[in-house]
Amino acid sequence: HYWFDLNRDWLPVQLPESKARVKTYTDWLPNIVTDHHEMGTNSTFFFQPGIPSRVNPLIPNLNQKLTEKVAKYHANYLDKIGSLYYSKEDYDDFYFGKGSTYPDANGGIGILFEQGSSRGHIQNSQNGVLTFPFTIRNQLTTTLSTLKAASELRIELLSYMNDFYVNNFNDSRKSKFKGIGFGNNHDNTSSYELASILKAHKIKVIETDGKKFKYFVPLQQKKSKLIKAMFDTQTKFEDSLFYDVS
């Protein structure tokens, strides 16, 4: 894909797969999204929450608490099959262009899974021989634990999503900032492309007369949190480190 990681493309939606994926996501608006990946062979199995000090400030605290509740199901299921695992290390919840973080700006719970890779059928590791069937078993097991968590926590998850959108809409209505204007008649192409990206996320974009700006994005709409995630400039951080967002 021209050296561009599909799992950084959830916000810019430049590749065909990303456009289809974001459209499907927006149509369904899931309560939980699982994002399955592989990591270095000598690692075991990771599931979120990630490093607590590296959570994007726009993500509600309740999101992380629900992620921890779901994590207990993963731990329980992996304990039953004797698989090693860890959490709250290595990975974070900061960049919204990843599959495990994009849901956090849309009222859902995004969960990253990272499995130590067998790099094919079988590989020696610091933890012993690692086989491809073993890695698949861990990924499948945490898929089933997620389904169990979604079923048993459904009331909390549904309430969270409802409150997420109600609170964001009310905050936008009370805010002195009513929207974001961008573009002009001297830069039609880039302005059009940015507007197209926003529309791909089902964000309302109004085309103006172009005297001051070409497009206007009102904050008082369903996707207000996602708009802030895309346009806000965050300059204060609890941690100085971040997982790769390139």
Where are these regions (language model features)?
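Divalent-metal coordination cores built from histidine and acidic residues
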Residues: 1-8
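Acidic active-site catalytic centers that drive phospho-/nucleotidyl reactions
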Residues: 5, 35, 114
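Intrinsic-disorder/low-complexity accessory segments
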Residues: 8-9, 14-16, 20, 24, ...
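Proline-aspartate-enriched helix->loop->beta-strand connector
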Residues: 25-39
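Short glycine-enriched loops at secondary-structure junctions
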Residues: 38-40, 116-117
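Active-site environment of divalent metal-dependent phosphoester hydrolases
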Residues: 39-43, 189
